[in-house]
Design a protein with these regions (language model features):
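Short amphipathic alpha-helical/adjacent loop interface patches that line ligand
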Residues: 4, 26, 48, 59, ...
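N-terminal helix-turn-helix DNA-binding core of bacterial DNA-binding proteins
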Residues: 11-54, 65, 81
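Short, locally clustered residues in the helix-turn-helix/winged-helix DNA-binding domain
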Residues: 31-35, 96, 124
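Conserved catalytic core of two-component sensor histidine kinases
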Residues: 56-57, 120
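Charged, amphipathic alpha-helical coiled-coil/dimerization segments
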Residues: 60-117
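C-terminal regulatory/oligomerization modules of transcriptional regulators
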Residues: 113-134
Length: 134
């Protein structure tokens, strides 16, 4: 677990938010909105494992920055769905590209073929764990 925490910290340091109008909390929520499409604030809070009130604050910041927009759920007009704006999508893409470029370079420069295979297998296992319902 410590290794995953260290790698996450390294990825963040390789893609600093200094020139971006968001925090890491904003960016992770925005990334999930881009990946999942329109989502309610409650669903997003559950997925991010934060309180609904905390997510409301995060969404307010994203909304103020023009990175998300609200719309009604076509199947249930009482629900408000949050979607990424084109600016929000571009921000996620730019941030992800920077981190992915660093990681790809590090993998190709530091790992041999066997280590690369092991890493791919470990990623599959971590995906399975992340998707677990328990």
């Amino acid at each position: 677990m410590r290794a995953m925490t260290r790698l996450r910290a390294r990825l963040r340091s390789e893609a600093p938010l200094d020139d971006l109008p968001v925090t890491w909390s904003h960016l992770t929520a925005l990334h999930r909105i881009v990946e999942q499409g329109p989502v309610t604030a409650t669903e997003l809070a559950q997925a991010e494992h934060v309180r609904r009130q905390s997510m409301a604050e995060t969404l307010a910041g994203l909304r103020a920055g023009g990175l998300i927009t609200d719309g009604r759920d076509p199947s249930d007009g009482r629900k408000v769905l949050v979607s990424a704006t084109p600016a929000g999508r571009a921000l996620v893409e730019r941030s992800a590209a920077t981190r992915e470029a660093w990681l790809s370079k590090a993998i190709s420069n530091m790992l041999d073929a066997e280590e690369h295979r092991v890493l791919l297998r470990a990623a599959e296992i971590m995906d399975r764990l992340a998707d677990a319902k328990e």
